[in-house]
Amino acid sequence: MFNLKNRNFLTLMDFTPKEINYFLDLARDLKRAKYTGTEVQRMKGKNIALIFEKASTRTRCAFEVGAKDQGAHVTYLGPTGSHIGKKESAADTARVLGRMYDGIEYRGFGQEIVETLAEYAGVPVWNGLTDEDHPTQILADFLTIREHFNKPLNEIKFAYVGDGANNMANALMIGAVKMGMDFRIVSPKEIPTDAALVAKCKEIAAETGAKVTITDNIEEGVKGCDVLYTDVWVSMGEPDSVWESKIKLLTPYRVDMNMIKMTGNPDAKFMHCLPAFHDEETAVGKEIKEKYGLSEMEVSHELFESKYSIVFDEAENRMHTIKAVMVATLGDQ
């Protein structure tokens, strides 16, 4: 039994492979308990603050439902619902909320903000997404891979295809090297992955048996892969001005049925943290169609709706894994 009580959850860099497996095992057990109606509440009477400086569907719902299932109460502080960063510093906000709440979630901008909250709050702080990292998403991804593949994570070959500089590329690389995976980032050279992070991850890979490959060659990058993963080409907070250049660079990297076939693996799966621009059924999708003539962006509609896609299992698992993080760090054992 691992005791992760009162630990912050800021990045998977802070956790050992055994601790990450513990989160995944706990999430699996909590999911089974919810499905069978045998869930035991371990956070009764706890109060949790959810700070969201960026919009959210899955992360907010996962924290709210997970907390409610476990008997905790939540306060949602949206983009206009608190003074953090505007009238009050992150350090001061942390010291106020830490007096009132048992745990604090933060979704927003710089990684340094969530780290400051953790330094000053005196209660567990959980990273719901920053510009640099998205660790709760990675737990959901790895639980989903466990459910769909009859082999351990250290035998998985995984390619992230698209914007190699965004927070999902970073977060997946960190998680993958911790768990000993064969991990590839397949991205244009013009969008480089953070060199210091790559170097750090290669150091970890040397200890865990993982492999890290950064390439702009799609065929080489996806060959033999079990999982192809992508994310939006323009992340929250990036200016509209980057759309045109990103589309030009990344259109050849759209994940589609042909790319799945390039893996040579009939059991390969497609994953995406969502939301995905795979059709014209959203305001942004319509705008992209009008401006750039594209009816799909980072993933083809055909692949998104195909048997290879496990994106909605992945989305559901956000709740089970986030619940596991809260129970492990805050719950009564």
Swiss-Prot record:
> Which terms does the UniProt entry file under GO BP?
arginine biosynthetic process via ornithine; arginine catabolic process to ornithine; citrulline biosynthetic process
Alphabetized UniProt keyword annotations: Arginine metabolism, Cytoplasm, Transferase
Q: What class of enzyme is it?
A: transferase
Pathway recorded for this protein: Amino-acid degradation; L-arginine degradation via ADI pathway; carbamoyl phosphate from L-arginine: step 2/2
What one GO molecular function would you report for this record? ornithine carbamoyltransferase activity
Disulfide bond in keyword set: no
Catalysed reaction, written as an equation: carbamoyl phosphate + L-ornithine = L-citrulline + phosphate + H(+)
Write down the InterPro entries for this protein, in alphabetical order.
Answer: Asp/Orn_carbamoyltranf_P-bd, Asp/Orn_carbamoylTrfase, Asp/Orn_carbamoylTrfase_sf, Asp_carbamoyltransf_Asp/Orn-bd, Orn/put_carbamltrans, OTCase_ArgI
Entry EC no(s): 2.1.3.3
Record-listed L-ornithine binding positions? N167, D231, S235, M236
- The main location class comes to cytoplasm
Top-rank taxon: Bacteria
Record's SUPFAM superfamilies? Answer: Aspartate/ornithine carbamoyltransferase
Cellular location(s) = Cytoplasm
Binding of carbamoyl phosphate: at which residues? S56, T57, R58, T59, R107, H134, P135, T136, Q137, C273, L274, R318
Record's GO cellular component, any one? Answer: cytoplasm
Q: Does the keyword Transferase apply?
A: yes
- What is the protein's known function? Reversibly catalyzes the transfer of the carbamoyl group from carbamoyl phosphate (CP) to the N(epsilon) atom of ornithine (ORN) to produce L-citrulline.
What's this protein's family per the entry? Belongs to the aspartate/ornithine carbamoyltransferase superfamily. OTCase family.
Q: What is the name of the protein in this document?
A: Ornithine carbamoyltransferase
Name of the gene encoding the protein in the UniProt record: arcB
